[in-house]
Amino acid sequence: MPRLPDRFDLWIRKARDCPDPARQLDYILGAMMALPAWYFLNVGTREKPQPATGEIEGERVLLVFSDADRVIEAAGEAKFPAAPPVISVPAPAALTECLGPGLLRCDALLVNPGEDAAVIPREQLAAFEREWRARDGAAGSGFWIPNLTSEEEDFWQQHGL
């Protein structure tokens, strides 16, 4: 059965309409940070989780999903040691972990692998994180999309977003 688009899907579609590729990634990362958590396919065990990775042009990409149902959908009929095979990490912690030396370290993120997938290089992720922290995103001040036009800013303010 086809999945109904959620708010994240709508942001992905908005990003696709943007002519500037860097701005597209800003929209996607802004939408990712608005999520309560990032979800990863666990190919390890419950005791020793291991997020699924892939390789694109020699780069280690980490598969990240916008919700747990997408992870289960991606797992399909495959058998994994942990059931359900989902790792859930709060969005701010996941952003930091992807840039650090830990388990989630990667060269790029592959967001929602499949038809509407987006690849976010590590450099873009690091630049976003720096700006996000500089604007107090880490303090929980809310959803932020960098480089909004004044009309977009007005829209968000008028609608209390």
Could you tell me what each predicted segment is?
Residues 1-161:
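An interfacial alpha-helical scaffold signature
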